[in-house]
Amino acid sequence: MSSTQISAWNAAGTWEERGHTIWAKARIEELVTENGTFELVGGNGIDADARVRIVGVKSCEGDASVVMIRGKPRRGFDFELTLNWEAAFASGGDDDEQDVIIKGTVHVPEFSRDGVEDEECACEVKVSDRNSEHAPRENTCVATLKKRCEDFLVRTLMTIDSELEERASK
């Protein structure tokens, strides 16, 4: 039975909800980790080759569903996300020195269909275990994510919305 069809118990076709949360959570993680790599804002000199990238989803709470109302599918999703990010910088010193790895999170309080319609998705960027020795690099990572992450998240929202619409019509 396709999701545009109604189940036997709902022969009148007034209302029926189908969950797509498991699919949406997996798809969000796939999209953000595959596409979440950004060149540093103002990256130059020794750090010119550095990138900041989303490495995983720390938490993803919420749901996604398609609701059939009088035979018409209505899709919706609403999640709260916390994404892990990291950036690696060459040590710039002796070959024996370790690269500098900076890590943090991007918190997205509302990753929902409303963001698609409004074309916005606010986020908060944090650095884990700040180190004054690496403050300029940490600040560059935060600035990069603040500048580039909203557009990236809106594109991801649009992809999820479009794919959920396809799932609703099957």
Can you annotate each of these PLM segments?
Residues 1-27, 31-170:
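Long protein-protein interaction modules used by eukaryotic assembly/scaffold proteins
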